[in-house]
Amino acid sequence: MKFLLLVLAALGFLTQVIPASAGGSKCVSNTPGYCRTCCHWGETALFMCNASRKCCISYSFLPKPDLPQLIGNHWQSRRRNTQRKDKKQQTTVTS
């Protein structure tokens, strides 16, 4: 019984002394990421904190890329213009 009490006291003391490292430490002061050995779902590794830990940053904190215009819309607009030119040429030829 005394041994069980001693073990529980030791575990209670250790939980107060040892820091919880499940969340990881911050990468750099201005970076909204955490140093981890393996990134969670929805995160990507931006750079290495040290030899074995990556700086994992959530996708929501990353900038959104500027996407170019869709090629399909551009092609349709060119096609309409050529059809109009053909109609104009036919009307000028017949007049």
From Swiss-Prot:
A UniProt-annotated Pfam family: Defensin_beta_2
Keywords: Antibiotic, Antimicrobial, Defensin, Disulfide bond, Secreted, Signal
Disulfide pattern: 27-55, 35-49, 39-56
BP-aspect Gene Ontology terms: defense response to Gram-negative bacterium; innate immune response; killing of cells of another organism
Location within or outside the cell: Secreted
Protein name (record): Beta-defensin 132
Organism: Homo sapiens (Human)
Principal location class: secreted
Region (Disordered): 74-95
The family this protein is said to belong to: Belongs to the beta-defensin family.
GO CC entries: extracellular space; sperm head
Described function: Has antibacterial activity.
InterPro entries: Beta-defensin (IPR050544), Beta_defensin_dom (IPR025933)
Comp. bias (Basic residues): 76-87
